[in-house]
């Protein structure tokens, strides 16, 4: 499940392979943009904003969102391409051709590079941005004090980058139920700072870890652990499905 850290890591990987290089192939397999060909353009930069990713050339910006199942694959040719590919980019890297393939992307569009900021203008503070603003994020969080905390954390207009995994993990380490109101959080500034710290330490990892134990099966506190013992107190982790999202919590550690 891609969240802000995954998108940040993906952007860093694409940047390393594409930035400063000329595109030798641009094959977009989305009907609306199938006629767009950026071959010959130089990739200036690749950036992320929350869960959004932008590949910028001189005139255009390739905007994508992974949503639930999307990914970008990078490698020397050939990188496997099948019916799930939404875009194929190639660029020369010294004497080798690099191929980048966007697979199962939830959103892919080509927009004016100089106006691409408009599509993310609604987002709250980006948890992984250099200009991260915890004061603004905390202020956004408490605007609706009766709102369930999980709902507020998942609202990208409040702060950008949190998905369901981090939402559940943050509720656990903060000792609050996902269904508790925002007003139950004693220190909103501390909560958003924890959110930033969680994503920051995971920004170079493909397998996120919130417990500090990177061994397989021990990386998360509650997410995906329904019916297993809480790592702190041993109480069985509970779960519920609301609005197509699964929520996990420890009945003893969270109130």
Curated annotation (Swiss-Prot):
Ranges in coiled-coil conformation: none
Domain of life according to the entry: Bacteria
DNA-binding recorded as keyword: yes
ZnF bounds (FPG-type): 221-255
Record-level GO BP terms: base-excision repair; DNA repair
Cofactor(s) needed for function: Zn(2+)
Binding-site residues, DNA: 67, 164
GO molecular function, one term: double-stranded DNA binding
Note accompanying the cofactor annotation: Binds 1 zinc ion per subunit.
InterPro entries: DNA_glyclase/AP_lyase_DNA-bd, DNA_glyclase_Znf_dom_DNA_BS, Endonuc_Nei2, FPG_cat, MutM-like_N-ter, Nei2_N, Ribosomal_uS13-like_H2TH, Znf_DNA_glyclase/AP_lyase
Residues the record marks as active site: 2-3, 51, 245
Keyword tags: DNA damage, DNA repair, DNA-binding, Glycosidase, Hydrolase, Lyase, Metal-binding, Multifunctional enzyme, Zinc, Zinc-finger
Catalytic activity as recorded in UniProt: 2'-deoxyribonucleotide-(2'-deoxyribose 5'-phosphate)-2'-deoxyribonucleotide-DNA = a 3'-end 2'-deoxyribonucleotide-(2,3-dehydro-2,3-deoxyribose 5'-phosphate)-DNA + a 5'-end 5'-phospho-2'-deoxyribonucleoside-DNA + H(+)
Enzyme Commission no: 3.2.2.-, 4.2.99.18
Role description: Involved in base excision repair of DNA damaged by oxidation or by mutagenic agents. Acts as a DNA glycosylase that recognizes and removes damaged bases. Has AP (apurinic/apyrimidinic) lyase activity and introduces nicks in the DNA strand. Cleaves the DNA backbone by beta-delta elimination to generate a single-strand break at the site of the removed base with both 3'- and 5'-phosphates. Complements an E.coli nei nth double mutant.
PANTHER family: ENDONUCLEASE 8
Homology family: Belongs to the FPG family.
UniProt protein name: Endonuclease 8 2
Organism: Mycobacterium tuberculosis (strain ATCC 25618 / H37Rv)
Record lineage: Bacteria, Bacillati, Actinomycetota, Actinomycetes, Mycobacteriales
């Amino acid at each position: 499940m891609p969240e802000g850290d995954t998108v940040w890591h993906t952007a860093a990987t694409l940047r390393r392979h594409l930035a400063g290089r000329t595109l030798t192939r641009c094959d977009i397999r989305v009907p609306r943009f199938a006629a767009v060909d950026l071959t010959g353009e130089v990739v200036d930069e690749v950036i992320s904003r929350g869960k959004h990713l932008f590949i910028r050339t001189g005139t255009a910006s390739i905007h994508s969102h992974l949503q639930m199942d999307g990914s970008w694959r990078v490698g020397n040719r050939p990188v496997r391409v099948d019916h799930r590919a939404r875009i194929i980019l190639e660029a020369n890297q010294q004497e080798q051709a690099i191929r980048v393939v966007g697979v199962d992307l939830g959103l892919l569009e080509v927009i004016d590079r100089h106006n691409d900021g408009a599509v993310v203008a609604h987002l709250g503070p980006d948890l992984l941005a250099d200009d991260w603003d915890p004061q603004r994020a905390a202020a956004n969080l408490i605007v609706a004090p009766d709102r369930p905390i999980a709902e507020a954390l998942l609202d990208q207009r409040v702060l950008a980058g949190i998905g369901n995994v981090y939402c559940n993990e943050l509720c656990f380490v903060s000792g609050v139920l996902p269904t508790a109101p925002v007003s139950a959080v004693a220190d909103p500034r501390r909560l958003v700072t924890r959110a930033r710290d969680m994503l920051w330490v995971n920004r170079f990892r493909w397998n996120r870890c919130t417990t500090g134990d990177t061994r397989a099966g021990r990386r998360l506190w509650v997410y995906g652990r329904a019916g297993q013992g809480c790592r702190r107190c041993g109480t069985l982790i509970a779960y519920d499905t609301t609005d197509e999202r699964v929520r996990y919590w420890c009945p003893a550690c969270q109130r």
